[in-house]
A protein has these predicted regions:
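C-terminal accessory helical subdomains adjacent to catalytic cores in phosphodiester-
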Residues: 2-17, 25, 31-46, 51-180
Length: 180
C-alpha cells in the first residue's frame, strides 16, 4: 500500500508499517506508546490483526478500546480479520460465507491466485496489494455482503464473524491518496 500512495492536496501522507508480532491488546498498547513518543503526529492509526488463537474476549474488546482512545485529533482503527488477513485478498477473487481456519483461508487464496493469475501465493508475498488491488471494488462489495450475512445471523461480536474482515475500511481514508 505504501508504494501506491501519492500526495494529494499538498497534505502529508506517511505510512509507517510496524510488524510487532503482538496480539490484539498488546498491539494497541504498542501503538498508543508509539504515538506518544514519535516525533511525528498521526491522524489515523490502523491496527491490522487476525483472530488467530487469541481469546475471543481480547479480540472483541479491541474495537471498543480503539473507539475509547480515539479523539478529535487521532483515530485508532481496529482492522481485524477472522480468521486471518488472507481473507481480504481472497475476497478480491470470490465471496464465501464458509467458516474457515487460517490455513483453509490461505489455501483458498493460493488456489485463486494460481488459477486466476498464475502466481504462487506465499505468506508475506511482496506486491500482494498491487496484484489484487484492481479488484478492490469487488472485494469491498463482498465485505458488505458478509456484514449483512453476519448481521442476519445475529453475529455482532467480531469473534463470532467467521469469515469477516474490516481491512477494507482503510480505503475510506486512504483511497483518495492512491495513485491511479
Amino acid at each position: 500500500v505504501r508504494a501506491a500512495l501519492c500526495a494529494a492536496d499538498e497534505r502529508k501522507v506517511a505510512v509507517i508499517v510496524k510488524g510487532t508480532g503482538k496480539h490484539t491488546l498488546d498491539l494497541l498498547d504498542f501503538a498508543v506508546e508509539h504515538c506518544l513518543y514519535a516525533p511525528e503526529t498521526f491522524d489515523h492509526v490502523w491496527l491490522v490483526y487476525d483472530k488467530d488463537d487469541f481469546p475471543a474476549s481480547d479480540f472483541d474488546a479491541m474495537e471498543r478500546k480503539c473507539n475509547e482512545l480515539s479523539d478529535g485529533s487521532r483515530t485508532f482503527h481496529a482492522l481485524w480479520s477472522n480468521p486471518c488477513f488472507e481473507l481480504w485478498p481472497l475476497l478480491h477473487f470470490r465471496y464465501t460465507t464458509a467458516h474457515m481456519s487460517a490455513s483453509d483461508c490461505q489455501h483458498a487464496l493460493a488456489q485463486e491466485m494460481s488459477r486466476d493469475l498464475g502466481i504462487e501465493y506465499r505468506k508475506n508475498l511482496d506486491g500482494l496489494f498491487e496484484v489484487v488491488d484492481g479488484k478492490r471494488g469487488e472485494a469491498l462489495q463482498r465485505v458488505g455482503r458478509l456484514v449483512t450475512y453476519h448481521r442476519g445471523l445475529g453475529n455482532v461480536k467480531p469473534s463470532a464473524q467467521n469469515p469477516a474482515t474490516k481491512v477494507g475500511e482503510i480505503f475510506d481514508v486512504i483511497g483518495p491518496y492512491l495513485a491511479g
